[in-house]
Swiss-Prot record:
Protein name per the record: Nuclear shuttle protein
Ranges where the record places region Interaction with Arabidopsis thaliana NSI protein: 150-187
One of the protein's GO biological processes: DNA transport
Membrane disposition: Peripheral membrane protein
Subunit structure, as described in the record: Binds to single-stranded and double-stranded viral DNA. Interacts with the host nuclear shuttle interacting (NSI) protein. This interaction may allow NSP to recruit NSI monomers to the viral genome and thus regulate nuclear export of viral genome by NSP.
Short sequence motif Nuclear localization signal: positions: 81-96
Signal sequence extent: none
Subcellular location: Host nucleus; Host cytoplasm; Host cell membrane
């Protein structure tokens, strides 16, 4: 006679689980009862444009840039605005690649209106500087950017290597500077300058970020930049009555 061996409890549990998985229990809903609510609305975020390489060209000239002897003017490099149409930047930050700067200087001696009179030769020094502002900030009600004297000290600093004051080195950094010695005897003298400045390298990358509260206020002006703005300092120093009129073009290469 053969005896039937009882199955172990573990084997029974395994057999029951296989049956349950193979033939799932169908739940029936009784009339009067409703199914629980399930949120089926999907949240779609706007698709951001991919990064792209662009070049922004800006020209700086006009009456505000006309310099008399021992005067200066400070402006800034305009960054691209943010827009969904494909122009400008696609994020609230950009990668600064390089800058190409070119320009001419019109220098002229002042105070001689008689063309028959021979004017003595007068000299002056024009200084153009690019300065990185790592933490751009302007207090409420203040419109002017830091002057040459606030950054470098007296105008006599134009004759030597430019060095930021000790109390400004924690925020500013000189990227590049150009000096041109100009002379005039009454007529206008023109001097040219040109240079290229590499900003980001394989080992060191410079990013600029923006506040961008909304797309309406997502410009590239100084007040909207939260990190790494670039100031442009114009200075002209001379011991004679001279005027200097620059015309500068700045091409900023960026990824954003």
């Amino acid at each position: 006679m053969y005896s039937i061996r009882k199955q172990s409890r573990n084997l029974q549990r395994k057999w029951n689980s296989n049956i349950t998985n193979r033939y799932p229990i169908k739940r029936k809903y009784v009339a009067g009862h409703t199914r629980p609510c399930v949120r089926r609305r999907l949240l779609y975020e706007p698709v951001e444009r991919p990064f792209g390489h662009n070049v922004l060209c800006e020209k700086q000239h006009g009456d505000v840039f006309n310099l008399q002897q021992n005067t200066s003017y400070t402006s800034f490099v305009t960054y691209p605005s943010r827009g969904p149409s494909g122009d400008g930047r696609s994020r609230d930050y950009i990668k600064l690649q390089s800058m190409s700067v070119s320009g001419v200087i019109h220098a002229k001696a002042n105070g001689n209106d008689d063309p028959m009179e021979v004017s003595p030769v007068v000299n002056g020094v024009f200084v153009f500087s690019l300065i990185m502002d790592t933490k751009p900030y302007l207090p409420a009600g203040v419109q002017g950017l830091p002057t040459f004297e606030e950054l470098f000290g007296p105008y006599s600093a134009c004759y030597v290597n430019l060095r930021l004051l000790n109390n400004q080195q924690h925020r500013y950094r000189v990227l590049h500077s150009v000096k041109r010695f100009v002379s005039s005897s009454g007529d206008t003298k023109v001097s040219q300058f040109r240079f290229n400045k590499r900003l980001s390298t394989r080992r060191y990358t410079i990013w600029a970020s923006f506040h961008d509260g909304d797309l309406v206020n997502a410009g590239g002006n100084y007040r909207n930049i939260s990190k790494n703005a670039i100031l442009v300092s114009y200075a002209f120093v001379s011991e004679h009555a001279m005027s200097c009129k620059p015309f500068v073009q700045i091409e900023t290469s960026y990824v954003g």
